[in-house]
Amino acid sequence: MNTRCRSHVLKAWKCFSEGMNYYIASNEDQYGPWRVGAAYPFIFQPNISRTMSDKAIKFPTAPHAHFGYKIVKTFYTPYENAEQTPGFLRYPAELRSLQKMLEHWNKGLAAAEKAIECADEKKKDEARRLEALGHFIRNSTITVMNIKKWWQLNMAMQNSATAEEAEACLDKIEALAYAEIENAKDTIPLVEFDSRLGWEPSMEYVCDKWHLEWKIRQVTDGALREIAAYRKMLNLHKQD
C-alpha cells in the first residue's frame, strides 16, 4: 500500500484496538448476539400465546455443525451467578462501555473507508476487506446494544403502572425492531463481499445472507406482529 493509504489503515486498526478495551461479553452475550452477530433474533418477551410454550426459538444451523444451535440462546435474558452484579444493574454500565466501543469503531471505519479511496488498484480489495470486517463487527456491536435495551424495555413495559406508560415502552421496543431490521440489511452486502464473515468452525455459517434474511423475517413476522397484538391488549384496558 502507498504511504497515504498505510496511515489510514494503521489508524483504523488503532481505533479498533482501542475500541476492544470497552468490549464486554457476559454469558448471555457470548451465547447470544456476540456469537451470531446481526443475525441474532429479537423475541418479544411477553407470552401472549395460548400454548404457554417456551418463547425461545431454535437458531437454524447446519445439521452437521459440531455445536450448531446448541450454543446459541435466542431468548435474551441475564444469566446470573453469585459472583457478578445482577443484569438489571450491570446493563446500564455495559451499555455505556459498549457505546465507547462503538464510537472508537466508527472512527476506525471512517479511516478504513479513506484507505479504500486512496489504495492502489491492486490493493483495493484488501482495503475493502478491512472495512467489511470492521463494519461487520460494528453492526454486531449495535445488535448487542439493541438487545440489552430490548430486554430493559420489555421489563419496564411489563412493570408499568399504567397502560400509557406501557405503550410508551412499546413504542421504543417497536423502534428497536425496525432498527434491527435495517442493521441486518446493512450487514448483508458485507457477508456477500467476504464469505469468511459470519462463519465459525463449531457452528458453520450463522451470519451469512440466509441467516440475516431469516432474522429479518423473524422480526417482521414474529416480533412486530406480537407488538401490534400487545398494543391492542393495552387499548382494551384503556377502553375499560
Residue ranges with predicted function:
Residues M1-D240:
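Substrate-binding groove of N-acetylhexosamine-processing glycoside hydrolases
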